[in-house]
């Protein structure tokens, strides 16, 4: 196994141009494939999850040209749902942003499609989405364990009507259904059961659908109305924003020990994870907002916070390691959906934070972190989870080094993360 040891960092300073957002990249690629016309996507993320989506689209008959650096892609839209006279097998790795939306889109399509992934993907739930799709006439069969991939879809179209979808575990199920709904044969009314988690991710979906010509009405995120029999229309060009979750590591570093600016997102970003900067501000950092940048600066000792972070689940992980540098006990609440991500992130974060000396309470849907007087050097297990690897790089901002096991797992969303982190680090 590869390891990377980060020596203590005296100060961070500089500017980081963010890679494209994973959430935005895969949504836009799928809609570009279904849309009428040709779409040029710029600042596309080059990472494993995007590669799985691109490979799937190619297998499904979508033609596209990818630039040499893989950050620009011209997609020739089908102007309709997918169709295949032969059975199709798609391997989607551990990419939830490919598995869930493609599952819904393929229910609209003609043909037989089998979706598989890595072993972890077989532990990531998809039942709430499949239940909703079946209500709209889909034929989906689980191949191993009920409620989880792999699965086979007999594509025969979706008929619309009223559908109830559980919103309490992941917003990706609703996102997937929403993106497929305009191509259903009738109008769709989607009612949410339970509390809808990660609402800002639904806003991303609605915003991108609008750019491709489809408007969705909703009653306070409880009922969504989508007209059927529509066709997505290419906007011509589509700029993928910088990834706000990826920004969190650099902003936290600036808040802890220096001054860092991230570019590619700003105050008008469509991504809810920019609200992470507000949490840093509550902890005592100085935050500056621009149209195309966010800057975080340390202006004194950070203070612990006790907050509900349901709306920013990915970026909230970064608060868990920033808490190692805060005065007092930090509590991150209402984050049950950490448990259904790339790994069970609640247990994983608790385990690794204890290794560096923190006192940690792990609850069903919360975590409490009290920093030690002195951080300890530890080898951090990353659980094939990109965000755990990136979060724990912040430990090096102390006077203690940190070793990251399997640092290459950041390739899921940010292949050159450690190079970029080194570019703002002074030793």
From Swiss-Prot:
**Subcellular location(s) per record:** Cytoplasm
Task: Tell me one GO molecular function of this protein.
Answer: 3-phosphoshikimate 1-carboxyvinyltransferase activity
Instruction: List, from the UniProt record, the residues annotated as the active site of this protein.
Output: 314 (proton acceptor)
Q: Keywords for this entry? A: Amino-acid biosynthesis, Aromatic amino acid biosynthesis, Cytoplasm, Transferase
Q: What are its E.C. numbers? A: 2.5.1.19
Cellular component terms, GO, for this chain's entry? cytoplasm
Binding residues for phosphoenolpyruvate:
22, 96, 124, 172, 345, 387, 412
The positions annotated for binding 3-phosphoshikimate are 22-23, 27, 170-172, 198, 314, 337, 341
Catalytic activity as recorded in UniProt: 3-phosphoshikimate + phosphoenolpyruvate = 5-O-(1-carboxyvinyl)-3-phosphoshikimate + phosphate
Quaternary structure, from the entry: Monomer.
State what protein this is by name: 3-phosphoshikimate 1-carboxyvinyltransferase
Q: Which gene encodes it?
A: aroA
